[in-house]
Amino acid sequence: MKTIILNQRKERDELLSRPYLTRRNSYDVDMLLSSHLIKLITGPRRVGKSTQALLMLRNKNFAYLNFDSQPLLDSWDANLVMRMLDDVYPDYEYILLDEVQNLDAWDMWVSELYRLGKNLVITGSNAKMLSSEMATVLTGKYLQVEMLPFSLEEFFDWNKIDLKALKPEQQTDASVLTDDYMRNGGYPEVVASRQLTRSYLDTLFDSIIWKDVAKRHHVRNITDLNNLAMYLVSNFCNPITANDLTEELGFSSVNTTQKFMDYLHEPYLFYYLPRYNNKLKLMKKAPRKVYVVDNGFVAAKAFALSENLGRLLENQVFIELIRRGYDTDKTIFYYRSRNDKEIDFVLRNGPHIERLVQVCYDMSSPKTEKREVNSLTECAGELNCNNLVIVTNNDERTIEKDGYKIDVIPISKL
């Protein structure tokens, strides 16, 4: 065990010596580390959770355990591990537990460490870490930081352009970068080297399905699981139901389909957006729209005869809203009016609708503008909301219709 931990210390030190892409933090690192609560960094694989945790602790004395290591898991002995940590990391202040969800009964062990006064930073690639798995023993004991692939603004930072303060001579470059991001996404490895995009994301997608879904849940029918994942990534931004998917893909039961859908959400690969309705029963019955965590997966995996820029932009807007803290269980929905007009995103704050967001890549056609504006104003009337936005690729203006003022903004100003 000591050899494993010593090897992991070498791994930690090597990781700390590397240069890293800069991320924008929505939190105060010093305040976070000063808290006695568990610091939990969650998000998809390979978005930089481990890097962020290492950078947070770079100038601190901290111990490190990487649970993506099979030798560590195979020889696991909690008491022995703690003795070896004291030996390898004398006088450590923090313990970094990387991808701790791979350890069986991890929550019980973490709870015990917390009870003993250990200051913990944890990373994990499973959305359910904050629900069923942590609901009992760790409730009220943690602070969460959720990480996603690079935002558009962070992508511009990497390319040394301030998205919020563009100079006239940067407009052409900015348009190229915005289009690049929409098509290829923001995974850190891909941002650093665009030549890697398709091969890297193809492998990553398959790895998530195998490590975080099939292996974790002991899925026997890998073919059906893969077929569902391919169907979802190819039909992103479209409404789906478990019943329809079961029939379309020839699965054995609706329960199996729903179970697989839930499994594919857990590692942050897919999100399912409910249709807004005041009646919870009707909302649960309605189709949900499926979104993928990064547009690059669409380029790498989707079956498509031609790219759909409108759907790519819509997916990008959705992920940006998730990044800002909107929750598909509580605060973000789509909506269909009584006349079947659709709004892409309904944003709720408590009991009130705070904003309606429509996405339209190109509004240069009068027919397209009329369709989008009519949908927005009709739904605004039904939902009693006056804060109306249409997000476009590069259009910016104000439209007034039926007493409503609609802000048309480019994605760069969302």
What are the language-model segments listed below?
Residues 41:
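Hydrophobic anchor at the beta1->P-loop junction of P-loop NTPases
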